[in-house]
């Protein structure tokens, strides 16, 4: 057995030794002590860092045989008929990796989570192996290494293109032969007869990378194998009793309210404020230093009064069907209340414009009372604190305006900072640096355990802790994303790309339900279509809008 195989066998023996990190299992390599070769291997393992891994499971070619076993609606991964076996090209003498399909990769990931590390390694790896088996197993789990030196070394030993997610064979010669890994003779002293296609440092790196890949699979959610089509979603939505809906800025853009992170979003519009980070507009420390930074641009995100989108009404429809467990919204526009969603069914994770409070005396008032001042780009002041503000800080301007045509700097003395924010009324929006509302923490723990369907709409899931809700929901609960762009750092079972209102109308049409919105009669008549982009991902669109968009783009591009 080669030394790389020996080191991996040590890893296989030690898979039951683990540490608990935030509820996730991390496997450790259990090396034998006593021999100099094992000590050398241990030092090499400790000195070698794991590579950066890219998840490429979605890049694998899809095979739609759907022969996976389903028992009581739960996917049971298949045990491989035999461990991985590499072949060799008869002409080049290079190893040939077997092809990997997306189905193969998903089954391997599910097998690891279902049966654990020890049984996974025993089932997928032969007793005699070399480092190339480890490389192939990493790819089978859906990961691609980024270390160029390591990839170059592997490429020299194999016929396949190792830089892509798909194990496509380079060259045209189909003649291959099954081979066993190189072996060390019994008389060969351990440590002196290293015989492996890769150098020992590369073999050690691969072992580290395999452990890292396995740890990531064990600690993250894997998509359900029996929930990936529109029909699956429609059927589940009809039968669900406790739907958890997580919404973001994308559900309000049809009303003219900008999102935050797109090229035309809010953050791209505030680059002229001289901030190191556009998100500092919502930084509590900066607001207390200079509230004019926020009030100069607050009108851009001020919600329209008593208006709401068809998507808001789509959530109301789910509520009216008795299916809505809770709507966790990251939006601050409070449009859910205008749509008729009950207060007890809404958690405004980042606060809202619904109310406002004095930062000094904490007097609370309806947010609408300061809307006109926000529109006029004035800093709203508390009537109770205003006399003291005038007495203590008579020279402080109450305008968010400018000095010599330039935006006022928020880098001033601490006394000036205190005076600028004294008695200022702030919308009850959760700024960066503030705790989330108590109702979030009160409800989320029980809601994630009770829900039977999670729908995330119009969000990029970039802001914690709300973004972690997808990882808190039990793994067997289907997760659906409705958004303009895919969210690659989460494992949604079904992704519906498109405009939120169009997707909502399409789903309502398929369910035979009516959305309680004034535009529903027109939306109901639209011939909304879809294209399947890949397994579990669809593009939903209105052909009329698409044609108009294409025409507009051609007109812009015309000389």
UniProtKB/Swiss-Prot annotation:
Q: Where is the active site?
A: 350 (proton acceptor)
Instruction: List, in alphabetical order, the GO biological process terms annotated in this UniProt record.
Output: heterochromatin formation; negative regulation of meiotic nuclear division; negative regulation of mitotic recombination; regulation of thiamine biosynthetic process; silent mating-type cassette heterochromatin formation
Reactions catalysed, as given in the entry: N(6)-acetyl-L-lysyl-[protein] + NAD(+) + H2O = 2''-O-acetyl-ADP-D-ribose + nicotinamide + L-lysyl-[protein]
Q: Output compositional bias ranges, type Acidic residues.
A: 52-62
Could you tell me the keywords of this UniProt record? Metal-binding, NAD, Nucleus, Repressor, Transcription, Transcription regulation, Transferase, Zinc
Q: Name one GO molecular function term.
A: NAD+ binding
List the GO terms this entry assigns under cellular component, sorted alphabetically: nucleus; Set3 complex
EC numbers for this chain? 2.3.1.286
Q: What is this protein called?
A: NAD-dependent histone deacetylase SIR2
Give the organism the record lists.
Answer: Eremothecium gossypii (strain ATCC 10895 / CBS 109.51 / FGSC 9923 / NRRL Y-1056)
Primary gene name:
SIR2
